[in-house]
From Swiss-Prot:
Places the protein is found: Cytoplasm, Cell cortex; Cytoplasm; Cytoplasmic vesicle; Lysosome
Gene that produces this protein: Fnbp1
Ranges for region Interaction with DNM2 and WASL: 552-608
Entry text on domains: The F-BAR domain binds the phospholipid membrane with its concave surface. The end-to-end polymerization of dimers of these domains provides a curved surface that fits best membranes with around 600 A diameter, and may drive tubulation.
Alphabetical list of Gene3D superfamilies matching this protein: 6.10.140.470, Arfaptin homology (AH) domain/BAR domain (1.20.1270.60), SH3 Domains (2.30.30.40)
Biased composition regions of type Pro residues, renumbered to the chain: 337-346
Bilayer topology: Peripheral membrane protein
Name of the protein this chain belongs to: Formin-binding protein 1
PANTHER family per UniProt: FCH AND DOUBLE SH3 DOMAINS PROTEIN, FORMIN-BINDING PROTEIN 1
The protein's assembly and partners: Homodimerizes, the dimers can polymerize end-to-end to form filamentous structures. Interacts with AKAP9, ARHGAP17, DAAM1, DIAPH1, DIAPH2, DNM1, DNM2, DNM3, FASLG/FASL, and SNX2. May interact with TNKS. Interacts specifically with GTP-bound RND2 and CDC42. Interacts with PDE6G, WASL/N-WASP and microtubules.
Cellular component GO terms, alphabetical: cell cortex; clathrin-coated pit; cytoplasmic vesicle; cytoskeleton; lysosome; plasma membrane
Keyword Protease: no
Residues with the Phosphoserine modification: 296, 299, 348, 358, 496, 520
């Protein structure tokens, strides 16, 4: 099968077909280019995804990756990054092995096609020229023959006419002979050109066109083979990265299999273990005995040994004690200390605080009661610890990590000691290196001045001394913590509320069990334990008592947001219960729905005191 013999008359169609083949090849190149762009975009998105979920340095997330599940996730992210790299390899290989080669091949193919069809058109033009020459000689021969016939007929006519002179007859005869000769010459020329054309036409259809079409056929077949090879390469590029992608997936599976739930559980224990013992049982208090009730064993009141006893004046302790349940102490400590805000500019004249309808109540101000409570010496140390604990909530971490539970504090101190030892070792190595260099300079003065190293050596030595002092300080704290951790029976006993006749030990060790020598443990997860020394002591005494009774009502004149601790928000026109009158500091204590209470500016409410409350 040959296009030269089978398609000898389909020159134009072959030209269109070969152009279509080049278009198909360019279309495939465009497809591969778009595939490479997709692979690059996909790889970029995968890398961004992996980077997005990587733990941030020096953040809490980085600490979370000590758990095996988080480590496995981190390994998954790293494997995903390698997975993305393989898609980049696919893109690069497709570009270098397919796109670049095909683009170059298309240019060569276009040039070869152009050359072949140029030769074909040239041969076609040549045969057309020969055909035109043949037609021209044929027409000339035909014309000369007709002219010769007319000249012969004219001569015969003149020769038959007796009236024509002999000279005219001779002239007609010569003209007929000339025309006859011209016809013979045209015939010979036509015969020669016809013979030549037939030769050219045979060569055109049996030699030139078959050769040209054969080249075009070979060119087209090479194009088809090349596009097939490119498709194979396309598949092989993908196949080459499959083993590596499989390794990435195997890495993810291996990371998943490395997850150890027991190990993670142990890490949680190590991270959050406080070192405290759980509280013991609470002793039954018999209220049927006709005796004066005392506060619970681990409260801050005086012991049976005659130590000063905390007095709460007034008829009702619930009325005088400004705390309720778990938040009793915190309510006292977080009550507003700043002056109340002034009322809005549209204050009505009727809203006059502390007017005739608000006589002064016969009770000591809350601040006076708190000061009296604080002056009890056995309690001062406990409250000082609590005060330090509350100050730590501002975000300042003590140097000795006293805001951490004992177990966590020990780990922090141990880590600090290890870090300092590493720094000491680093500085020591540097000092040794400088000393050796100085010895070299002393032996070989031409290499350097030994005195130039004295300043650096003194600086490094000073740094070592500072670090050693720092390490010694933390080691002392660490030894103190490690020495206290085993002694937990007394601590549990103190937390349980058992009264053993040693209240002075409770008071003395109140802060020591809850704090380090320079601060108290006040982390949010253990805030309740932090003030159990206070809150637990008083909960037994006051949990069963009724809330402070209402001494009147009030109507909100303006809306108050109540954003500070100890305050409560009110809405204009709202009616609430008054449980404590203004003591001269500009704040009135109110209650809503028997469970919400707090302070509002006296100028924001209109107070109506009960007559019975005024007289009490």
């Amino acid at each position: 099968m040959s296009w030269g013999t089978e398609l000898w008359d389909q020159f134009d169609n072959l030209e269109k077909h070969t152009q279509w083949g080049i278009d198909i090849l360019e279309k495939y190149i465009k497809f591969v280019k778009e595939r490479t762009e997709i692979e690059l975009s996909y790889a970029k998105q995968l890398r961004n995804l992996s980077k997005k979920y990587q733990p941030k340095k020096n953040s809490k997330e980085e600490e979370e990756y000590k758990y095996t599940a988080c480590k496995a996730f981190l390994s998954t992210l790293n494997e995903l990054n390698d997975y993305a790299g393989q898609h980049e390899v696919i893109s690069e290989n497709m570009t270098s092995q397919i796109t670049v080669d095909l683009v170059r091949y298309v240019q060569e193919l276009k040039q070869e096609r152009k050359s072949n069809f140029h030769d074909g058109r040239k041969a076609q033009q040549h045969i057309e020229t020969c055909w035109k020459q043949l037609e021209s000689s044929k027409r000339r021969f035909e014309r000369d023959c007709k002219e010769a016939d007319r000249a012969q007929q004219y001569f015969e006519k003149m020769d038959a006419d007796i009236n024509v002179t002999k000279a005219d007859v001779e002239k007609a005869r010569q003209q007929a002979q000339m025309r006859q000769q011209m016809a013979e010459d045209s015939k010979a020329d036509y015969s020669l050109i016809l013979q030549r054309f037939n030769q050219e036409q045979w060569e055109y259809y049996h030699t030139h066109i078959p050769n040209i079409f054969q080249k075009i056929q070979e060119m087209e077949e090479r194009r088809i083979v090349r596009i097939g090879e490119s498709m194979k390469t396309y598949a092989e590029v993908d196949r080459q990265v499959i083993p590596i992608i499989g390794k990435c997936l195997d890495g993810i599976v291996k990371a998943a299999e490395s997850i150890d739930q027991k190990n993670d559980s142990q890490l949680v224990v190590e991270a959050y273990k406080s070192g405290f013992e759980p509280p013991g049982d609470i002793e039954f208090e018999d209220y049927t005995q006709p005796m004066k009730r005392t506060v619970s064993d681990n409260s801050l009141s005086s012991s049976k040994e005659g130590k000063p006893e905390l007095k709460f004046g007034g008829k009702s302790r619930g009325k005088l004690w400004p705390f309720i349940k778990k938040n009793k102490l915190m309510t006292l400590l977080t009550s507003p200390h700043q002056p109340p805000p002034p009322p809005p500019a549209s204050a009505s004249p009727s809203a006059v605080p502390n007017g005739p309808q608000s006589p002064k109540q016969q009770k000591e101000p809350l601040s006076h009661r708190f000061n009296e409570f604080m002056t009890s010496k056995p309690k001062i140390h406990c409250f000082r610890s609590l005060k330090r604990g509350l100050s730590l909530k501002l975000g300042v971490t003590p140097e000795d990590f006293s805001n951490f539970p004992p177990e966590q504090r020990r780990k922090k101190l141990q880590q600090k000691v290890d870090d300092l030892n590493k720094e000491i070792q680093k500085e020591t190595d540097q000092r040794d290196a400088i000393t050796k260099m100085k010895d070299v300079y002393l032996k070989n003065p031409q290499m350097g001045d030994p005195a130039s190293l004295d300043h650096k050596l003194a600086e490094v030595t000073q740094n070592i001394e500072k670090l050693r002092l720092e390490a010694h300080k933390f080691e002392a704290w660490l030894a103190e913590v490690e020495g206290r951790l085993p002694a937990r029976s007394e601590q549990a006993r103190r937390q349980s509320g058992l009264y053993d006749g040693q209240t002075h030990q409770t008071v003395t060790n109140c802060a020591q069990d809850r704090e380090s020598p320079d601060g108290s443990y006040t982390e949010e997860q253990s805030q309740e334990s932090e003030h159990k020394v206070l809150a637990t002591d008083f909960d037994d005494e006051f949990d069963d008592e009724e809330p402070l009774p209402a001494i009147g009502t009030c109507k909100a004149l303006y809306t108050f947001e109540g954003q500070n601790e100890g305050t409560i928000s009110v809405v204009e026109g709202e009616t609430l219960s008054v449980i404590e009158e203004d003591k001269g500091d500009g704040w009135t204590r109110i209650r809503r729905n028997e469970d919400e209470e707090g302070y509002v500016p006296t100028s924001y409410v209109e107070v109506y005191l009960d007559k019975n409350a005024k007289g009490s």
